């Protein structure tokens, strides 16, 4: 009888456990407003700051060199973990941070890579765990609040 109980419990656990394949990545793409670059099971979205003209000691910085923001999702069961690094101007930090925190995401760092750059750019590290489409919508909304796409 005990063996039968364990077998039933194992079957219920296996049948109710959602897998990474259950995540509908097209919904995440739609929420992000772009398609991901996919490597194995990691879905990465780039946000290069091509709208900025940043100089450092008279040298123009190319977005691909130091102005490439991104977020990446990795499936964890039926949910996902998200991590990223967003490139922001000083005036964009508070509105983006407020939206991300309001949406349940974590800000793990804000720092500067390019001292003496003009305009000053800052790098906001974000992270979270949960429904990937919901987290993507929060990130997209936060970036839109700073007029970033």
Residue ranges and their predicted role:
Residues 20-121, 125-149:
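Long, contiguous binding/interaction regions
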Residues 5-15:
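Bacterial N-terminal signal peptides
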